[in-house]
Every structure is written in structure tokens, then in C-alpha cells.
């Protein structure tokens, strides 16, 4: 039996939801959830927690830049969706899930004056333009494999496109609608 800290339980919960994350993404999520004045989630502390989990749990893996449970595999689109969630939530989303319908990759909530829910979805050159129109009711951040918007892309209100920058961050473009 392994005794886990609250932070380690959160790490496992996060991996059960997301499958596979980069170390820097996991560190940002843990820091966003638990860091308070007088309690720092340093890289050293994070590395120690990951080491303890790896030695205590057989299905917990840390390889190079990735942390995952036994069946988790890196998915570049999902990893980019996690980056977007971290950027928009300043590393502290209220909640998130990957239990979404395709082409959505991730849904997350931002806390503030009003709870705001966003989805990150993948747009490809073969996507039906009606798909974008059908998804009008929610806030959606669209991404593409190329990291650039598709030619002639028109977005409805509350939809955004996340253009990937050279440093891995994103520039967000919104609709021109009312």
C-alpha cells in the first residue's frame, strides 16, 4: 500500500483524465492547483513526487518529457489542447475532461466572475465547414495540424483559432461577427 500526498492524488487523477502529459504541463497544473503563499511546488518537489509515484505504482511511467499511466500514449493534438488550456487558464483551470465528442479534444472550465466553459477542437482541411456553424452555442478554440488557420476560415461568435507560435505558445484569433 502506498500513502499518497494530496498533490500525488491529483497527479494520478490528472493522468487518469488526460492519459499522457508533458512534465512541464503536469507541473503547471499541480502548481496552479496547490501553490499558495508559503507553499511552493518547485521542480525539485515535483521531481520527488514523480519519483515516489514511479517507484510505488507499477503502471506509472516517466519517460524523457512525458508522464503517463500504463496505456497512455502521447497525442500531439491533445498535448497542444492542454497547452491552450494552460495558457487561457493561467495554469489553473477549474476542471477539465477529455470525454468529449470528435472533433473536440478537451473541455475545460475557467473560474472568474462567471464560470466559462471552453472546448478545444481539431480542424482539418477535410472538416465540413458546417461543423463550425453547428457548434455555435459554445466557446471553441480550434487548432490545426499546421498551426495556421485554414484559408478562408470564417468563425462564428465565441469561436477562436489558436495559431501556434515558434516558441510553442499560441496567438488567438476570434470571429469578426457581432
Task: Show which residues each predicted segment covers.
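Intrinsically disordered, low-complexity serine/threonine- and proline-rich regulatory segments
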Residues: 1-2
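Short acidic, hydrophobic short linear motifs in intrinsically disordered regions
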Residues: 21-38
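Short amphipathic alpha-helical interaction segments
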Residues: 36-56
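Nucleic-acid-binding surface
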Residues: 5, 10-18, 24-25, 52-116, ...
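Short, structured coil/loop segments at alpha-helix boundaries
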Residues: 5, 38-39, 74-78, 150-155
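Electrostatic, structured charged patches in enzyme active sites and in nucleic-acid/phosphate-binding
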Residues: 82-178
Amino acid at each position: 500500500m502506498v500513502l499518497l500526498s494530496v498533490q500525488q492524488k491529483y497527479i494520478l487523477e490528472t493522468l487518469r483524465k488526460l492519459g499522457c502529459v508533458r512534465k512541464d504541463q503536469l507541473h503547471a497544473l499541480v502548481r496552479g492547483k496547490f501553490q499558495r503563499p508559503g507553499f511552493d511546488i518547485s521542480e525539485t518537489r515535483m521531481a520527488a513526487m514523480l519519483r515516489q509515484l514511479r517507484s510505488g505504482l507499477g503502471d506509472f511511467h516517466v519517460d524523457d518529457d512525458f508522464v503517463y499511466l500504463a496505456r497512455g500514449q502521447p497525442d500531439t493534438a491533445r498535448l497542444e489542447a492542454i497547452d491552450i488550456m494552460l495558457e487561457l487558464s493561467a495554469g489553473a483551470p477549474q476542471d477539465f475532461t477529455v470525454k468529449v465528442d470528435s472533433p473536440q479534444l478537451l473541455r475545460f472550465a475557467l473560474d472568474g466572475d462567471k464560470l466559462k466553459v471552453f472546448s478545444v477542437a481539431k480542424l482539418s482541411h477535410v472538416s465540413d465547414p458546417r461543423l463550425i456553424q453547428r457548434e455555435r452555442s459554445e466557446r471553441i478554440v480550434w487548432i490545426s495540424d499546421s498551426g495556421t488557420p485554414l484559408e478562408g476560415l470564417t468563425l462564428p461568435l465565441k469561436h477562436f483559432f489558436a495559431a501556434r507560435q515558434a516558441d510553442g505558445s499560441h496567438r488567438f484569433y476570434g470571429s469578426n461577427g457581432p
